[in-house]
Amino acid sequence: MDDRMRLGAVLVFFTALFFWGNAALPVTAPVEVNYAQTAKEMLAAGNYLSPQIYGNYWYDKPIFFYWELIAAFSVFGVTDFAARFFPALFASAGLLLTYALARRLYDARTAFWSVVILGSCVLYGFLAKLILTDLTLFVFFGGTLGAFCLGYREGRRGYFYLAYACAGLGVLTKGPVGFLLPGLVILVYLVVRRDLRALGRIALPTGLLVLAAVCAPWYVYMYLAHGADFVNTFLGIHNVLRATVSEHAQWNVWYFYLGIYFLGMFPWSFALPLALLRAWRTRPVLDAGTQFLLVWAIVVPVFFQLMATKYPTYSFPAFLPTAILTAHLLRRNTRVLSAGALLGGALYLAVVFGAVHYAPRDGHFSGKAAAELLMQTMQEDDLLVSCGDYTATVPYYTGHPMYALATREEIAARAPKAMSWNSKNVMPFLPLDELPQDRTVYLVVERHAFATFDETLAGGRWELLGTMPTEGREKLRVYRRVP
C-alpha cells in the first residue's frame, strides 16, 4: 500500500470515528449547551453577528464558532448531530494539517505516524465530539504557526500572509490569544535561534493588515453596536479576569498541564519523554524545524500555567507539535508505534461505544430526557422553573423559557456583576415568593437541591412526573403543580 492509500485509509477511519454516534449524544450542560443555545437563538432571530442567550446579548466568545453552529443548524436542523458536526469536521482537518506540516518538515513516514498518534490520543478524540471551540482554534493556531515555520525555512512571503490570515481566524474564534500566543511562540523561537532580525522579513506591517482585514470588521461592529458593555465583558471578564483571577481555584496547581499532557496524550504520554531522553544523551544537532516544534510544544503550556485560570483544553494547541515530535523520534520503532496505535484505537472505540449507549440514559450532564418528559404535557403558557444547578439543556430541548428559582438573597448574590464570574449567570431568575399559585408550574430539581426541595417546597401539592436516569442514582426530578 503506497503512502497516499495508507493516509487515506487512516483519515477515513478517524473521520468515521469522529462522526460515529454523534446523533445519539445529547447536548450537555453546563458548557456545550451555552454554545448550542446561543446559535439556536441567533438563527431563530435572524441575528448573525451579536451572540445572544436567553434573550440577552452576551460576549463569552467571538463569533466564528457560532457561525459554524448556525451553518450546521441551517443544513441539518437543530439536532445533536448538527451541533457536533463542525468539531468532528475540524478534527479531521487538524489531522490533514498535521500531516502536511510533518511531511514538509520530515518525510511521509513521520507524517503518517504523526496523524496516527494525534488521532488516537485521548484528548483529541474526546474534543472531536464536544461542542467546544477548541478544535477550531487548534486548526487556526496550527495553521498560523505551521505557515510561519514553512515561510521561515523557505523564505516565501506567501506563507507569512497565510499565517496572519489564520491568526485572524483564531482571533475570531477565541479572542486575542489567537494572535498573541502564536506571536509569543514565534518570538521565543527567534530568540532561541538568535535571529531577531527575522522580524524584518516576516511581512509585519502588511501582515497585520491582513490579520485586521479578517477579524477587525466583526470587532468594530460589536463595539459600535454594544459599546463599553462588549469591551468590559469580553475583554475585561473573559480575557483579563481569566488571566488574573482563577475561575477554578482547585485546578490552580503547578503540575496542572503536566497532568493534562499525560492524560490527554495517552497512550503516547511516555513515548515522547523517553525518546527525548534518549536523544539528549546523543546530543544531536537539532534542525530549525525540530527546534520550532519544541518551542511550540513548551511555550503553550508554560504560558497557560502562568495564567490564573486553568482549563483542561487550554494547552491543546501544543498537541500538534508533540505528535509530530513523537513520530519523528519513534519513526524507526515500528513495534512501539503499532502497539500505541492499537491501544489508542481500541480505547477510543470503547469510550465512544459506552458514551453513545450511556449518555441518552443519563440525567445529569444532559436534561434531554427530562425535556422529552416535559414536552408530553407542558403547554405554551405553563411556567417552567428549576431548583439547584441550572440544567440549561432543558430549555434548549423544550424551547420553553426556564427560570432559576431562588430566594431574593440568593438571586442578589448570583446576579451578574462587573469583573466577576457572576457575569456568566445570564439565565432568567424567579424569586421563590413570586411563584404563582394560579398557574400550572413544572419544576426541574437537580440532585444538589433535593434536600432544599424537601425542606421548602415538598408540601405544595407537587406531583412527581419522573426521575432521571430511570436506573441508578437519581440526578434530576421533574414535578408538576396545577392550580
Tell where the protein language model's regions lie, with residue ranges.
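Glycine- and aromatic-enriched periplasmic loops at the membrane-periplasm interface
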Residues: 57, 390-391
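Signature aromatic-anchored transmembrane alpha helix within multi-pass, membrane-resident enzymes
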Residues: 330-353
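Short, flexible loop segments at the rims of nucleotide/cofactor-binding pockets, characterized by
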Residues: 154-155, 247, 359-364, 418-424
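Phosphate- and divalent-cation-binding pockets in alpha/beta enzyme and binding domains
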Residues: 67, 275, 393-396, 452-453
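Generic hydrophobic alpha-helical scaffold/packing signal
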Residues: 259, 303, 318, 371-375, ...
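Membrane-integral, polyisoprenol-dependent glycosyltransferases
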Residues: 1-336, 400, 474
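Luminal/periplasmic acceptor-recognition loop/helix of membrane-associated glycosyltransferases
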Residues: 366-389, 399-483
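Hydrophobic alpha-helical transmembrane segments in integral membrane proteins
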Residues: 313, 351-373
